[in-house]
């Protein structure tokens, strides 16, 4: 993989390419690119529609995760925020590739099970971090409805993760195949 391939993929999306290229290239430095994945998607928040792009770059020693979000502001118009996480491969936890298929049965498939033709509907890449955790807290309580005591907090600590979902219908078959290829290459490098 070359920087020119990554540049073409980012510029081709037309979503703040200068910002994203500068963010990724400054974090990448002189390191070689083993693989990359670019995912562009709409986002929904309350009553607004936005755009988000994730760029994952696998190097021999790190996984770079660039997240760029569109920010709509009536006073300033459209702007964007971009951040890059640099995760050493040794700190990457589980790398999960999930494939969802519909089983299409041919008319004579009952006699020949090999005649089932699975049809890929969507694919997910889930990355779990070993070093980052998310803590969700909420006020603790008791079963006495009249109790006014402070019971502190209760919560759950879970590993932070990231999920990228693609489907042939939304992203195209070629992008889904690229996701599968990227995920399998990453799985082979994480120990």
Say what each PLM segment does:
Residues 72-191:
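Acidic, Ser/Thr- and proline-rich intrinsically disordered linker/docking segments
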Residues 1-62, 66-72:
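Anionic N-terminal interaction surfaces
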């Amino acid at each position: 993989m070359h920087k020119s391939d990554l540049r073409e993929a980012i510029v081709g999306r037309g979503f703040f390419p200068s910002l994203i290229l500068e963010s990724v290239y400054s974090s990448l430095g002189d390191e070689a690119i083993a693989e990359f994945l670019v995912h562009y998607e709409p986002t929904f928040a309350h009553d607004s529609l936005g755009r988000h792009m994730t760029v994952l770059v696998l190097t021999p020693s790190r996984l770079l995760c660039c997240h760029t979000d569109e920010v709509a502001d009536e006073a300033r118009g459209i702007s964007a925020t971009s951040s890059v996480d640099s995760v050493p491969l040794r700190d990457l936890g589980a790398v999960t590739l999930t494939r969802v298929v519909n089983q299409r049965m041919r008319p004579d498939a009952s006699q020949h099970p090999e005649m089932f033709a699975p049809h890929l509907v969507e694919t997910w890449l889930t990355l779990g971090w070993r070093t980052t955790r998310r803590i969700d807290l909420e006020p603790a309580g008791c079963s006495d409805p009249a109790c006014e005591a402070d019971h502190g907090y209760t919560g759950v600590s879970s590993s932070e993760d990231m999920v990228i979902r693609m489907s042939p219908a939304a992203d195209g078959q070629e992008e889904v195949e690229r996701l599968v290829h990227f995920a399998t290459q990453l799985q082979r490098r994480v120990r």
